[in-house]
């Protein structure tokens, strides 16, 4: 279609701008959390996160701590957006077609495998710590694109597309990991109800219902029953996203930008990037440094996470991408060099949002969760600083 060449870049540019801006706000939220957690406000901060909110009766109970409302409720909206992005990119975007998906797909696979292996090697003598193997396997797209935005035209657009596609596939892998490895004891009745609601979403899609309201109503019920089932509630957001139609609302208007999926994605981008993810960062990044020494970083769990993010990510992303390009399986992104590709691989070590999220699922005691935060913050910070520094000194894109 004649509109396709202009439509794709505009969608991509809007996405990159939104994610980069969200990355800046997330950075501020994380810094504020660390300041508050190490100030006289710390008791109030942690007490607020532990405050229970909701409703409880014999017939119906929905009462969680503020932290759980953020991690199970608000983050379900984040995962809804992630699911919408994955579906759109695979059906109508940068991940449509085998040739486009090979390089970011291979790099994403390496970028999940190598950090997990590094973590497992460091924690091989600690059976309890092995549960955190997936923590360094994630990449924070908002943080990484925020760093790239600071570099402007010094980084070619092709590498920004590569990083975006890689991070989306990385999110898909993280979703699969959460579903398979971090599911609690199952409530079969709630799971059956969730299955029925999922079937209802499929029926709405097959009947070509293009109004969003029915999907969102069923999706809200789906979230409740998934929460009660023992499967992590955020996966309800992904399931809902896969049911939202990509069909055009008006057949006379070309392009998927007129679809219910795009309308919902557009409506969610700014609230998620500028509110939900920063709130999550503020609630989960706060860790007190009181009494901490060098041993707090060199303990197996934080060391495994930090090395997994910094060392494992660059080895996996760059190593697998280099191998794919050298063997002819994939092509180098346009106007990019191997040095720039390595710089982007360093930025993939910024794990933050998804790493903190998986850390909260992997462990349930406060001391271990604090250890995961130290590892995530250290690995992400070193990756961000060195990745930015390298891309800054390299010659700009052609």
From Swiss-Prot:
GO terms for molecular function: sodium:proton antiporter activity. It is found in: Cell inner membrane. It catalyses: Na(+)(in) + 2 H(+)(out) = Na(+)(out) + 2 H(+)(in). This is Na(+)/H(+) antiporter NhaA. GO terms for biological process: regulation of pH. Keywords: Antiport, Cell inner membrane, Cell membrane, Ion transport, Membrane, Sodium, Sodium transport, Transmembrane, Transmembrane helix, Transport. It is a multi-pass membrane protein. Belongs to the NhaA Na(+)/H(+) (TC 2.A.33) antiporter family. It comes from Bordetella parapertussis (strain 12822 / ATCC BAA-587 / NCTC 13253). The keyword Transport applies. Na(+)/H(+) antiporter that extrudes sodium in exchange for external protons. One of its GO terms (cellular component) is plasma membrane. Its main location: membrane. The chain crosses the membrane at residues 21-41, 66-86, 101-121, 132-152, 161-181, 184-204, 216-236, 274-294, 305-325, 343-363, 374-394.
């Amino acid at each position: 279609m004649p509109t396709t060449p202009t439509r794709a870049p505009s969608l991509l540019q809007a996405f990159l701008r939104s994610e980069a801006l969200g990355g800046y706000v997330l950075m501020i939220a994380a810094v504020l959390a660390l300041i508050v957690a190490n100030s006289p406000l710390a008791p109030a901060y942690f007490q607020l996160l532990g405050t229970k909110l909701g409703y409880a009766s014999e017939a119906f109970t929905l009462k969680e701590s503020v932290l759980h409302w953020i991690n199970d409720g608000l983050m379900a909206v984040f995962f809804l957006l992630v699911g919408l992005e994955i579906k759109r990119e695979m059906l109508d975007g940068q991940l449509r077609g085998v040739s486009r998906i090979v390089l970011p797909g291979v790099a994403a696979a390496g970028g999940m495998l190598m950090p997990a292996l590094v973590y497992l090697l460091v924690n091989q003598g600690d059976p309890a710590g092995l549960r955190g193997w997936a923590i360094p396997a994630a990449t924070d797209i908002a943080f990484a694109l925020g760093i790239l935005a600071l570099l402007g035209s010094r980084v070619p657009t092709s590498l920004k597309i590569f990083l975006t596609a890689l991070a989306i596939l990385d999110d898909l892998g993280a979703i699969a990991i959460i579903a398979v490895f971090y599911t609690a004891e199952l409530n079969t009745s709630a799971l059956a109800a969730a299955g029925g609601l999922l079937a209802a979403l499929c029926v709405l899609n097959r009947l070509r219902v293009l109004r969003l309201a029915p999907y969102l109503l069923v999706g809200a019920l789906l979230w409740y029953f998934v929460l009660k089932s023992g499967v992590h509630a955020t996966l309800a957001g992904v399931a809902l996203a896969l049911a939202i139609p990509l069909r055009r609302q008006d057949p006379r208007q070309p392009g998927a930008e007129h679809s219910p999926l795009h309308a919902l994605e557009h409506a969610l981008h700014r609230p998620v990037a500028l509110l939900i993810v920063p709130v999550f960062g503020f609630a989960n990044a706060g860790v007190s440094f009181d009494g901490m020494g060098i041993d707090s970083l060199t303990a197996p769990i934080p060391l495994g996470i930090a090395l997994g993010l910094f060392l494992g990510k660059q080895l996996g992303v760059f190593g697998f991408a280099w191998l794919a390009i050298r063997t002819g399986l994939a092509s180098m992104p346009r106007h990019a060099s191997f040095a720039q590709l390595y710089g982007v691989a360093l930025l993939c070590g910024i794990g933050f949002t998804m790493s903190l999220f998986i850390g909260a699922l992997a462990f349930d005691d406060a001391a271990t969760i604090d250890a995961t935060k130290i590892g995530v913050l250290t690995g992400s910070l070193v990756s961000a600083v060195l990745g930015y520094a390298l891309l800054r000194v390299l010659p700009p894109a052609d």
